[in-house]
Amino acid sequence: MSERKALLILHGKQALNEAVRAAVENKRKQGWKLAVRLTWEAGDAQRLVEEALAAGYRQIIAGGGDGTLRDIAEALAKQPGKASLVLLPLGTANDFSRAAAISLEPAEALELLEAPAHDIDLGEVGGQIFLNMATGGFGSQVTANTSEDLKKVLGGAAYLFTGLSRFSELHAAYGELQGPDFHWRGELLALGIGNGRQAGGGHVLCPEALVDDGLLDISILPAPQELVGTLKNLLSDGFGIDNMFVRARLPWVEIKVAEGLYINLDGEPLEGESLRFAARAGALRVHLPKDSPLLSATHRISHPD
């Protein structure tokens, strides 16, 4: 790249982050023209991306949590090929960045400005974009707090049911999923549809997901009614919840459920009874570590035939 120029769109809560300030100053000392803009309210990310592109920026840095990354990725995807994205993970979960092996240290993360950009996929449903993952579940009662009983039953997977709304009761509902050469129907407890691999602060739902294969990884947690009643015993006996998932890898999948399915798109809520998820292949250029586990090339190297 001839001009070392980038714009950092930083979540407003991170304005006083000294590590970020030091990292920015360090890049400036290296000769980068690095400008910073802060988000304050909904819609700011979209506006700031548009202003950055109009000002000639071709590298944009997203500084914040998974929601901030999603907002900026969505804004960039609306203007394909205009600029590439660097991720500066500053949230509590940082699920996409962790799975991609992006450093959580601001100075190291900004070194990706020098790394090649890769064309990666995005997930799409109902006109909304997600960079990392969509998770969904059913709740018969919604409360303000995470159910402690539910946490005890499900352990690390509890977020599946509490990530969007705090469900005080765990129950299944009938669902049907259909995609190319794939059809599943039955009682469904929860599901994950991943472009990335993990959600909810490190819980791996789609362990083999790649961001440049043009596919979404589907993980279904089925639940015949008799299984719901014995789920606690199964888990306490060492029957890992990971073994219970039905998995598929598809360019798109249609989901129909008997009652409203609560979906979490990288923190954004969505609800529906008939939804179509699709991968938008190569929709975004992102700077990733050369050995990122989410890249197909890395996968081939580490898993030779």
Swiss-Prot record:
Enzyme superclass (EC): transferase
Molecular functions per Gene Ontology: ATP binding; lipid kinase activity; magnesium ion binding
Matching InterPro entries: ATP-NAD_kinase_N, Diacylglycerol/lipid_kinase, Diacylglycerol_kinase_cat_dom, Lip_kinase_YegS, Lipid_Phosphate_FormReg, NAD/diacylglycerol_kinase_sf, YegS/DAGK_C
Major subcellular location class: cytoplasm
Binding site for ATP: 39, 65-71, 92
Subcellular location: Cytoplasm
Top-level taxon of origin: Bacteria
Function in brief: Probably phosphorylates lipids; the in vivo substrate is unknown.
NCBIfam families from the UniProt entry: lip_kinase_YegS, PRK13054.1, YegS/Rv2252/BmrU family lipid kinase
The protein's name in its UniProt record: Probable lipid kinase YegS-like
Protein species of origin: Pseudomonas fluorescens (strain Pf0-1)
